Amino acid sequence: MGRNRKVVIDRAEEKRGGDELSAILLSIKDPEELALFLDDMLTENEKRDIIQRYLLMDDLWKGKSQRDIASDRAMSLCRITRGSKMLKKKNGFMRRYFSEKYDDFTHI
């Protein structure tokens, strides 16, 4: 008793849950409502992790070196490399987002 057991979900259930979460996110138009949703769904550490991942990707896009990011943000190079790989995905959302944010369609 008292042991944490890993909950297993099958692919169909995972897809259904992902589709429903996507629909919820698309329905939220107000930033305060989005903040409430994220507060309900994520722990403080999970929110911090997402924010850190966004900031490191922003740093990478602006040309900051992985070593400088690791030093400045006290992050592992492994984690930063993962963010770099996301930015290199040809059809990746974050690549498109930063291209539009910085009006730079040839970066990375």
Language-model-detected regions and their locations in the chain:
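Short helix-capping/linker segments at secondary-structure and domain boundaries
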Residues: G63-I69, G92
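Short alpha-helical "recognition helix" segments of helix-turn-helix
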Residues: D68-A74, I80
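Intrinsically disordered, low-complexity basic tails/linkers immediately adjacent to helix-turn-helix/homeobox/MYB/SANT
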Residues: Y97-I108
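General nucleic-acid-binding
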Residues: M1-I28
